[in-house]
Structures are given as C-alpha cells and as structure tokens.
Design a protein with these regions (language model features):
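Exposed, low-structure sequence patches enriched in small/polar residues
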Residues: 1-175
C-alpha cells in the first residue's frame, strides 16, 4: 500500500514467492518459499526489508557443497534476513544485509554490504562484499568471502552495457 498522508513513508511491500526446481525427468529437486512480511520505502528513497526464506533440497548421493559431501536425502531449512538500502538517486548509496539461519540443516550466517557510486548520470560503479559462514555438523567450518565489482553505462532507459567481475576465496579465482 501507498501512504499519501505521510511524508516519511511512501509505501510498504508485503510479498510471497514460491519456486519449484525439477530435473529433466520432471522430478522435484528443491523448492524455495520467500516470505517478506515487511518492506518499507521511506520518503528519502531509503528502504528496509525483513524476509524469511524456506528451502528444501533433495541432493543425489555424493553431491558436494563447497567440498563438503552431503548424504542423500531431503534437507529443509530456514533463513531470515534484514537489509537496508539507501536511495539510488544519491551520488553515493550503500546497502547492508545480515542473514541468519541454516544451510543443509547446519547453522549459517551471512553478512554483506555494498557501495555504489554514480560518477555521472550515465555511469554507475559499485562493489559488494559478503562473508558467509556455515558451521557444518560433520565437517570443518566453511567461510566464503566474495567481492564483486560492477560497472554500468546507460545509453537510454532501454539500452545499457554492464560488466561484472567477482572473486571468491573458495575457488581463489576471478571470474
């Protein structure tokens, strides 16, 4: 809904999304449900969002996640996140996010942040950094650090060129 009677609050967003993933034989592999009970967009253009995500996965025997072998079976877990994003209309905008929950039924957390610079009207440069930690029950802790850089040139609202570069400590490579 929109809030025309207030200057400080423009709109609130309440969403639900559901995704199904199947293999080529149309067998269910995993599902994802996203609940966003609260998203607020303020008069300044800044926004804050809380959401919960429910995951299920049925990995085949021997599948590995970041080098950790998973037992065949059905996995189910929840994640909860709180995020803030400053208005993209500013020359400099920031984003922050924290997420807690599980991954493959092991405790997990994620912290991230980003910075975007609007160098001039047609050129945007930004980078994001995140740290994800999983405390596996049967393996050493995984700590994944990812840094991403992105540059975008806008020629018109319908035409732009964007380039992304990313590094993560798991693969120890740039891609």
């Amino acid at each position: 809904p929109n809030y025309d009677e207030t200057d400080w609050l423009v709109t609130s967003i309440h969403e639900y999304a559901f995704e199904l993933y199947t293999d080529t034989g149309n067998n269910l592999i995993d599902t994802k449900q996203r609940f966003q009970p609260l998203g607020l967009v303020f008069g300044s253009g800044d926004s804050i969002t809380f959401e919960s995500t429910h995951h299920t996965d049925r990995p085949p025997s021997g599948e590995k996640i970041w080098g950790i072998p998973l037992e065949k079976g059905k996995y189910e877990w929840w994640n909860h996140s709180l995020s803030f994003e400053s208005s993209g209309k500013r020359k400099i905008s920031v984003s922050l996010e924290t997420e807690r929950g599980e991954m493959y039924e092991s405790p997990a957390s994620r912290y991230g942040g980003g910075l975007k610079l609007k160098l001039w009207k047609k050129f945007l440069f930004g980078f994001d950094y995140s740290v994800s930690t999983i405390d596996w029950e049967n393996a050493p802790q995984t700590k994944l650090k990812v840094i991403t850089g992105k540059a975008t040139i806008n020629f018109s609202p319908d035409l732009f060129i964007s380039n992304l570069i990313q590094y993560d400590n798991d693969s120890d490579s740039v891609g």
